[in-house]
Swiss-Prot record:
PANTHER family linked to this entry: DNA-BINDING PROTEIN HU, INTEGRATION HOST FACTOR SUBUNIT ALPHA
PROSITE patterns per the UniProt record, alphabetical: HISTONE_LIKE
Complex formation: Heterodimer of an alpha and a beta chain.
Keywords: DNA recombination, DNA-binding, Transcription, Transcription regulation, Translation regulation
Source species: Serratia proteamaculans (strain 568)
Protein name as catalogued: Integration host factor subunit alpha
UniProt gene name: ihfA
Family as reported in the entry's similarity comment: Belongs to the bacterial histone-like protein family.
Amino acid sequence: MALTKAEMSEHLFEKLGLSKRDAKDLVELFFEEVRRALENGEQVKLSGFGNFDLRDKNQRPGRNPKTGEDIPITARRVVTFRPGQKLKSRVENASPKE
């Protein structure tokens, strides 16, 4: 099961007493700020959670798996996430759910 933005909004509504509209807007605003920062080439640091970084990948050789033809994989910028120590610790110590 995955946590969705709608579920995050519902949690804010229940825990903080925000209106459903305000809770939804808060979640959307948070993710929009993360997107904006990354689009502007900034690192996003969320204390106690982790860091979103941008990494430039160089062009490299690749192969079409269907035809075996050699094709170049173009250079691109990717987003990476490095979890913080607190998040790592909580995940490692959590009991698995089935």
